[in-house]
């Protein structure tokens, strides 16, 4: 899902400047994280609308009698809703993966800071 992001090809010198200003690709991680949150919100809204639609149709069926085609259609809609729930679960799994990356990054960053401080101390 995050691979759907398409970036324009930039000249090499712009890429070098960008790489120097963000060597750990934090900006890309932030964009991907925001996109993932957007997709989760979008899926939640879609599930909410589908659920409301199914409930309204069920109410109509109860009021006007049960028809086999309608039942089959509702079963199909329920299956679609379950698929959307599965997709949403995948998005949450991706969030968990991002959390793991962030935790790992924090510990690596602490190590870099410690090494840098030692380097600065040796230069004094």
UniProtKB/Swiss-Prot annotation:
The keyword Coiled coil belongs to this UniProt entry's keyword annotation: yes
GO cellular component, as recorded: BLOC-1 complex; cytoplasm
Family to which this protein belongs: Belongs to the BLOC1S4 family.
Compartments where found: Cytoplasm
Membrane-spanning intervals of the chain: none
Organism: Kluyveromyces lactis (strain ATCC 8585 / CBS 2359 / DSM 70799 / NBRC 1267 / NRRL Y-1140 / WM37) (Yeast)
UniProt cross-references to PANTHER family, sorted A to Z: BIOGENESIS OF LYSOSOME-RELATED ORGANELLES COMPLEX 1 SUBUNIT CNL1
UniProt-listed CDD domains: BLOC1_CNL1
Subunit text: Component of the biogenesis of lysosome-related organelles complex-1 (BLOC-1).
Keywords carried by this UniProt record: Coiled coil, Cytoplasm, Transport
Protein's gene: CLN1
GO biological process: endosome organization
Primary role: Component of the biogenesis of lysosome-related organelles complex-1 (BLOC-1), a complex that is involved in endosomal cargo sorting.
Protein name according to UniProt: Biogenesis of lysosome-related organelles complex 1 subunit CNL1
Region of interest (Disordered), residue spans: 1-20
